[in-house]
Amino acid sequence: MKNLSETEAEVTMQENVVHESLPQIPVATSVSCCFVLAVLYVGSLYIWSTKHNRDHPTTVKRRFASVSMVMLAAPFFVYFFSSPELLSRVPFPKLLGLRLEGLWQAVVIPYSLTVLLFLGPIFVNMQNESVRSYFDLDYWRGSFGSIIWVRNHVIAPLSEEFVFRACMMPLILQSFSPLVAVFITPLFFGVAHLHHIAERLSLGVELSTALLIGLFQFIYTTLFGFYSAFLFARTGHVMAPILVHAFCNHMGLPDLQDLWQQDLWRRVVAIILYLAGFVGWMFLVPLATDPSIYDNTLYWNA
């Protein structure tokens, strides 16, 4: 059996092979492009002059239009600033994680893996009978008829993952190794969510409270960004982080207050499932995201 140092050496060597196989572009170029993309995405949310809050239908519709324009513009950054050698040997859609090879695996496996992570919260929701609504046709009609639901479950995951993963990761991966890239792009993603501080201040929230909430939001969006970027690099598919993002938006952060309001036996079972889900997720992440499962030899070699 191989000892830990030998395994780590193999991983490092493998990572370097993948990194060196991608033609390189200057760090300043890739980072600058990502910075501009982040500014464009956030800036597009505020180009409209409005007195309404972010949940007003008019505001939501205008922001749909704005981020759609950014989604159209973002691929041009990848096309014009990527290495010509890379563009000549790899189909452009593949760079963006748009390909058919390994697609069904990218749809099913990362999503199932994330469901495992939320095993505890799902159990708590089942005790509140909220799961039954998922089998009600009226629930889905109402959901797709709600512009807020569509924003949170469709537009936000689609636009954010396409811009911050499909269009940033290909650039960053041409300047950094996969593991480093996974930890860089989420910082842009986390910082991009700090604009909510200004929104809260405009609603009359105290500065200290707005900053505290903003810091907390930066932390959890950045942590999610690590996971999402990891999925993109390992699977080579943008669909994986899009679906996982939508699911996480639906679940939200675990409601610990709801957990402690459960009966004792349900609370014990829920805590066990919280721990089992997390441990199982940690154990399965490297196995379930093995690049060979997804025919991914571009960003992270098997």
From Swiss-Prot:
GO terms of biological process kind: CAAX-box protein processing
Domain of life: Eukaryota
InterPro entries reported for this sequence: Rce1, Rce1/LyrA-like_dom
Swiss-Prot/TrEMBL catalytic activity: Hydrolyzes the peptide bond -P2-(S-farnesyl or geranylgeranyl)C-P1'-P2'-P3'-COOH where P1' and P2' are amino acids with aliphatic sidechains and P3' is any C-terminal residue
Keywords: Endoplasmic reticulum, Hydrolase, Membrane, Protease, Transmembrane, Transmembrane helix
Chief location category: endoplasmic reticulum
Topological category with respect to the lipid bilayer: Multi-pass membrane protein
TM stretches of this protein: 27-47, 64-84, 104-124, 171-191, 212-232, 236-256, 268-288
Root EC class: hydrolase
Location in the cell: Endoplasmic reticulum membrane
Active site: 160, 193
Pfam hit, one: Rce1-like
Entry GO terms, CC: endoplasmic reticulum membrane
Free-text function comment from the UniProt entry: Protease involved in the processing of a variety of prenylated proteins containing the C-terminal CAAX motif, where C is a cysteine modified with an isoprenoid lipid, A is an aliphatic amino acid and X is any C-terminal amino acid. Proteolytically removes the C-terminal three residues of farnesylated and geranylated proteins, leaving the prenylated cysteine as the new C-terminus. Is able to process K-Ras, N-Ras, H-Ras, RAP1B and G-gamma-1.
Family annotation (PANTHER family): CAAX PRENYL PROTEASE 2 (PTHR13046:SF0), PROTEASE U48 CAAX PRENYL PROTEASE RCE1 (PTHR13046)
Name of this chain's protein: CAAX prenyl protease 2
Record organism: Drosophila melanogaster
